[in-house]
Amino acid sequence: MTQLKQARKGIVTPEMEAVAKTEGLQPEFILKGIADGNIVIPANKLRKNLKLCGIGKGLSTKVNANIGTSTDFGSVASEVEKLKMAEMVGADTIMDLSTGPKINTIRKAILENTCLPLGTVPVYQAAVEAKDHYGAMVKMTADDLFGAIESQAKEGVDFVTVHCGVTRQVIDTFKGQGRLTDIVSRGGTFTAGWMVFHGAENPLYEHFDRLLDICREYDVTLSLGDGLRPGCIADATDRAQVAELLVLGELVKRAREAEVQVMVEGPGHVPLNQIEANVRLQKSICEDAPFYVLGPLVTDIAPGYDHITGAIGGAIAAAAGADFLCYVTPAEHLSLPDVTDVRNGVIASRIAAHAADIVKGVNGAAERDHQMAIARKKLDWETQLKLSLDPEHARVTRDRFKTRGKACSMCGDFCAMELAEKHLGVSVSRC
């Protein structure tokens, strides 16, 4: 029985209780959110010792870290190292986006080495295996694709990105639209390429009930991918993107009717003035399904710093109602990320998530900032470090220059906090 089915029966599951405890909320709040479809708990029923994570309305904004090999680079050891770094700096979930050799071995190693919910894009496995077996990705069969989905579900994968909304009608809209960057989603490109080669409908859309059967059996959460997400700000919120979103809205309804948990993925590259509108549009069309956004990146001209462009967009999107941020690393658009990129990407997205949670009124978010302000007024460095999102980095930075007094090396004897207390009588007790 899925979490959604149990919620509709009024059954508070151990998973709901665990999420409620983490969020500082009542279990009944989580139950209602799942029953209504605006909260999901990605938790394959076969996973053991899972660190449960609730995603959706009224909960803290969550952060996902993508890892995985490419055709030319990556190994089990390197991906496990990235995984451990992502865990250490506070990622809530992991996605394995491997497309390199030993794709199944990599995924199994990640599952064995993490307690975080794991997501995948099963079409990657199907495409890699089709290239190996048939000589071309487009020669995979629908059975190959569904076989990959089911095998990953049996392994314990908790959520799957599936590009069900890339339909023949949506592709026609895309062709008529005209874009600068065409299709930038790998899964979207694989799917569209297969459809053109075979002259057939997207099997994930045509046989959506088959997909639902697999997800219901293992309680795998569907993450409806945005195969036509904009790849530059000039393409943002165009007809092709919206056409796909309309299809996803229909599929959200069908998933809920089948008692399968579902969330929806979103853009992409979006200028600042369109982000809130994108969130509102998704929430309306998809009936408040949890919204999982990549960034969004607010400018195209910052390669090497896209963890910053993504964090800017992510903060605005989450404050407007997005629930789940997929991190962006400094390596975005340039290379496969290394372990340092993973660290920087997670931290940047966690900053964005926390900033948004203050706006949302998430339990405890603003209080943490209040406690930080008190610690700063007291020049209580240990408490400041403890409260920081990245204590290790903060400590290293603090210790670079030793000072004689309590003030930092920026101000020294001219510390504004110390001078205010000394000459104006403004003590910490007023905080």
UniProtKB/Swiss-Prot annotation:
It catalyses: 5-amino-1-(5-phospho-beta-D-ribosyl)imidazole + S-adenosyl-L-methionine = 4-amino-2-methyl-5-(phosphooxymethyl)pyrimidine + CO + 5'-deoxyadenosine + formate + L-methionine + 3 H(+). Substrate binds at N66, M95, Y124, H163, S185, R186, G187, D226, G227, L228, R229, E265, Y292. Binds 1 [4Fe-4S] cluster per subunit. The cluster is coordinated with 3 cysteines and an exchangeable S-adenosyl-L-methionine. Pathway: Cofactor biosynthesis; thiamine diphosphate biosynthesis. It is an enzyme of class 4 (lyase). It comes from the Bacteria. [4Fe-4S] cluster binds at C408, C411, C415. The keyword Iron applies. GO terms for molecular function: 4 iron, 4 sulfur cluster binding; carbon-carbon lyase activity; zinc ion binding. The keyword 4Fe-4S applies. Keywords: 4Fe-4S, Iron, Iron-sulfur, Lyase, Metal-binding, S-adenosyl-L-methionine, Thiamine biosynthesis, Zinc. Its EC number is 4.1.99.17. Transmembrane segments: none annotated. One of its GO terms (biological process) is thiamine diphosphate biosynthetic process. Belongs to the ThiC family. This is Phosphomethylpyrimidine synthase. The lineage of its organism: Bacteria, Bacillati, Chloroflexota, Dehalococcoidia, Dehalococcoidales.
